[in-house]
């Protein structure tokens, strides 16, 4: 069994399509078929069920897949460590970031690329659940996101800053001149809220638990970009972490008094796989992020 065969197997298991997998591997379809068949012969059992319509992983294939991914990840780390013995900063750096943290990371990304032009940075922006799943599968080197309410023993979360919930409005909104607002006062305004399950919405729901306030929730969505646009172009008030408006023109974060006095904070974190090797480029990016103005001015 060779690493090359495991790489081919993993790609086919991902795509379940010989034609697509061979294109992404830059090999011919016949080469891929031959290598998969050779691997199956070595193992003495089929890894895929094939017919004219589809390709399906067998039970043996499902068992092999996580082991193959772990082996490929270990081999990649071995090469990285040898490269880093030569003090060479290169290779790929794969970062996951939730929508709320994109603007915070932008400053560090620009500085990092300027300092280390030989490192190829791949940034994936998605939901926390998707990014955490990809982190566990070793598809990402680290994730920048809020600390989830339920912890995963496989993931280490390093706190960068603590934040509270705030009312986000456009700079011409009547609230923009206020130093703060209460949960009671929020009842007067039309709200555009993040959907349930997001960190900001969970923080808001915890704040209002046990109260009898009636809010005018007009819109719910899970896209920060659209919430920003709605806030900029209308008098809707949205509720997000204070950090989300860093670098955003035309928006103002108004602290919610009840949130400032509440012990339940939203913790911005770097998430990594626990007890695993962290490549030098990831360590350096994390260091630069911690020292960035975006983080320092948003730290308590």
Which sequence ranges carry the predicted segments?
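Short helix-boundary/capping micro-motifs
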Residues: 10-28
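N-terminal winged-helix
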Residues: 29-30, 34, 80, 86-116, ...
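A late-sequence structural motif
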Residues: 104, 253-299
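Short beta-strand-centered segments that line the small-molecule binding cleft or hinge
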Residues: 107-111, 129-165, 169, 233, ...
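Hydrophobic hinge/microswitch elements
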Residues: 127-139, 146, 199-255
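Flexible hinge/capping segments at coil-to-helix
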Residues: 154-191
């Amino acid at each position: 069994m060779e690493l090359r065969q495991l790489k081919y197997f993993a790609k086919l298991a991902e795509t379940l399509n010989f034609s697509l997998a061979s294109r992404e591997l830059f090999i011919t379809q016949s080469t891929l078929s031959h290598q998969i068949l050779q691997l199956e012969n070595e193992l003495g059992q089929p890894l895929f069920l094939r017919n004219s319509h589809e390709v399906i992983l067998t039970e043996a294939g499902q068992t092999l897949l996580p082991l193959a991914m772990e082996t490929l990840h270990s081999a990649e780390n071995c090469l990285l460590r040898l490269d880093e013995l030569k003090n060479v900063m290169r290779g790929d750096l794969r970062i996951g970031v939730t929508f709320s943290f994109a603007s915070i990371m932008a400053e560090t990304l620009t500085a990092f690329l300027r300092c280390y032009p030989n490192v190829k940075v791949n940034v994936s922006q998605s939901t926390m659940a998707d990014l955490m799943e990809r982190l566990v599968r070793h598809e990402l080197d680290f994730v920048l996101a809020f600390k989830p309410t339920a912890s995963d023993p496989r993931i280490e979360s390093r706190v960068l800053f603590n934040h509270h919930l705030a009312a986000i409005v456009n700079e011409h909104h009547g609230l923009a001149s206020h130093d703060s607002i209460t949960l009671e006062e929020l009842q007067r305004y039309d709200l555009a809220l993040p959907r349930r399950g997001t960190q900001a919405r969970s923080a808001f729901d915890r704040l209002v638990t046990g109260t009898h306030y009636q809010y005018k929730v007009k819109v719910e969505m899970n896209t920060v970009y659209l919430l920003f646009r709605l806030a900029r172009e209308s008098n809707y008030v949205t509720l997000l972490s204070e950090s989300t408006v860093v670098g955003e023109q035309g928006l103002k974060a108004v602290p919610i008094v009840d949130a400032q006095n509440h012990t339940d904070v939203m913790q911005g974190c770097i998430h990594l796989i626990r007890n695993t090797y962290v490549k030098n480029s990831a360590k350096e990016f994390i260091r630069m992020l911690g020292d960035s103005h975006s983080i320092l001015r948003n730290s308590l």
